[in-house]
Regions:
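Cyclic-nucleotide recognition modules
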Residues: 59-120, 124
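A cytosolic small-molecule/anion-sensing beta-strand core signal
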Residues: 21, 40-41, 62, 88
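Phosphate-/nucleic-acid-contacting segments
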Residues: 152-191
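Cyclic nucleotide-binding regulatory module and flanking cytosolic helices
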Residues: 1-26, 66, 71-75
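A residue-level structural signature of the nucleotidyltransferase/glycosyltransferase Rossmann-like core
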Residues: 36, 58, 92-93, 164
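His/acidic/aromatic-lined binding-pocket segments of jelly-roll/cupin-type domains
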Residues: 17-18, 27-29, 33-40, 57-59, ...
Length: 191
């Protein structure tokens, strides 16, 4: 996907930019919102709250990406598809009314192609994450998640690869469908 096209498109249209600080929420799952958000810079975590009250983490996003697009395109207001929490010191977003966003998409073929590619990519990512969690057990889910973190935050060091991002065992548990951080600690010690 051509993130530069998306960012330049919003810049040309003078779409307002907002900033959020670490551990503040941009959206809450299920609450009404009228805007579409596009991450410009920073790191965010998307998650939902399960029926038993636990948080199920969906993904970290650290590149320009459309954040809140997974609902219908005609309603002025729609419920947020998930929680979005800022994980970097600051994150910057473009904020555009949903109806105006979809108007732009319908008028611009390249933006339409971007949105179609966005949906295909998000579906592929969701299938891959589910496959990793379902087919590999808890240890495999953690290993797979750590491998995904290398692609997002990894940098080469003398001893190998360093995941240059602070993440708690509780967050790892939330990404891997594990109930407690103690289970994550035990599995990490066994690796």
């Amino acid at each position: 996907m051509d993130n530069e096209y998306l960012l330049n498109f919003f810049k040309k249209k003078n779409v307002p930019i907002i900033q959020k600080k670490r551990h503040t929420y941009l959206t809450y799952y299920g609450l009404e919102q009228q805007d579409t958000y596009v991450l410009k810079e920073g790191v965010i975590k998307t998650s939902i709250i399960l029926h038993d009250g636990r948080e199920f983490n969906i993904s970290y996003i650290n590149t320009p990406d459309i954040i809140s697009l997974l609902k219908d395109e005609v309603s002025q207001y729609t419920s947020a598809p998930f929680n979005v929490r800022v994980e970097s010191d600051v994150a910057t977003f473009y904020r555009i009314p949903r109806v105006l966003f979809w108007s732009y998409v319908n008028q611009d073929q390249k933006l339409q192609d971007y949105v179609n590619a966005y949906y295909r990519e998000k579906l592929s990512e969701a299938i891959f994450r589910q496959q990793c969690m379902m087919m590999n057990g808890k240890t495999g889910a953690i290993c797979s998640f750590l491998y995904q973190l290398i692609h997002l935050f990894g940098r080469k060091v003398e001893a190998g690869m360093l995941i240059d991002f602070q993440i708690t065992n509780n967050d790892i548990a939330g990404f891997c469908g594990i109930t407690t951080r103690n289970s994550v600690s035990r599995i990490l010690c066994e690796l």
